């Protein structure tokens, strides 16, 4: 299941890059559109297969004893992963006519696919650090989609989007370090809310401030 988990996360980005670089897909819009739809259909199948792998855990990177990029497949994550894959597939099908006149369709499609990889990574995140990393990847990868039309208005919107995102990222990073210090871990576990409630009052206050 570990290999399947890695595929489910990184397949869209890998497929998008391959389609973008394949000579036959550069000039043939119809072939490229079919390839993107096929890749997204495979991604949907992968996320559906991961529904049978609930409980799968994997550490991708150890930064410290408490801060690490780890994945944890649970029912909630599986539901959102299947939902995201379905939405992306349907969006790709309906976007063919909408984007058909666009001269930069290839560039849009590769970032479209890469953003899905970041979203799937969030769905299977096993800690606040993992969620943060994949969320910031999604933010950076979606900037080219915001400025896609390359008009002054689109560029201004992209800059504003990036500034807001960076500011939010700084606050999120501070929150992660705070919780890591008070709780000793930022790993998602059952009963996490009760754990936060039993922590020192400072951590409880921060939970109330950061929680949506």
Predicted regions and their residues:
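Alpha-helical multi-pass transmembrane bundles of energy-transducing inner-membrane proteins
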Residues: 27-30, 107-212
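Transmembrane helix-loop-helix hairpins at membrane boundaries of multipass inner-membrane proteins
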Residues: 1-7, 14-110, 185-206
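Short conserved micro-motifs on helix faces and helix-strand junctions that flank
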Residues: 9, 71-72, 85, 115, ...
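Membrane-embedded alpha-helical segments of multi-pass membrane proteins
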Residues: 10-14, 42, 134-141
């Amino acid at each position: 299941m570990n290999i399947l988990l890695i595929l489910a996360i990184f397949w869209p980005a890998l497929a998008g890059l391959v389609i973008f670089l394949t000579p036959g897909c550069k000039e043939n819009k119809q072939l490229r559109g079919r390839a993107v739809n096929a890749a997204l259909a495979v991604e949907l199948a992968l996320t559906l297969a991961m529904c049978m792998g609930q409980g799968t855990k994997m550490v991708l990177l150890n930064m410290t004893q408490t801060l690490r990029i780890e994945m944890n497949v649970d029912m909630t994550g599986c539901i959102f992963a299947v939902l995201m894959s379905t939405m992306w597939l349907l969006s790709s099908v309906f976007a063919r006519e909408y984007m058909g006149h666009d001269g930069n369709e290839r560039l849009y499609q590769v970032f479209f696919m890469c953003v899905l990889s970041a979203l799937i990574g969030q769905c299977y995140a096993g800690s606040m650090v993992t969620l943060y990393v994949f969320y910031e990847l999604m933010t950076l990868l979606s900037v080219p989609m915001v400025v896609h039309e390359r008009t002054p208005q689109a560029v201004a919107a992209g800059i504003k989007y990036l500034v807001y995102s960076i500011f939010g990222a700084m606050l999120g990073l501070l929150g992660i370090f705070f919780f890591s210090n008070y709780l000793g871990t930022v790993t998602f576990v059952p009963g996490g809310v009760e754990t936060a409630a039993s922590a020192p009052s400072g951590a409880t206050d921060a939970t109330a401030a950061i929680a949506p």
